[in-house]
Amino acid sequence: MKWWLILPLLAAPAIAHADPCEGRLPDRAGQVFSGQTRYVGDGDGLCVGDSTNPSTWIEVRLADFNAPELNASGGRAARDQLRRLVMGRRLECVATRGRSGRVIVYDRVIATCRLDGRRVGDLLRAAGVREGGN
């Protein structure tokens, strides 16, 4: 069997679900950044940017909310609710250290973001989104 013919087919789903955010990440705790929400990948991950160019979008992992993974029970509902709350709206974010002590984890900045002065994590909880991710 010619495995080299099959490998691109196996990789295609991963590529199709890759997020488009490619901007430079804030790398110090306390760094403030903001932008319009351009992309929501899951229930606690999103991208903000001030232009329509994905190479400027900052990928964020919310520090104050742990959504279920997309393939777990409640994961898609969490993502959909986050989209409804923030998509296209301006967020003000502050980079913070995650549980590992790092600000950047898995090519995402750990941050607390606010929408109209309210923490996005609090908005998700108020909307009834359950926590349960990693």
Go through each PLM region and give its residues.
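Small beta-barrel nucleic-acid-binding modules, primarily SNase/OB-fold domains
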Residues: K2-W3, A14-N134
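Sec-dependent signal peptide hydrophobic core
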Residues: W4-P8
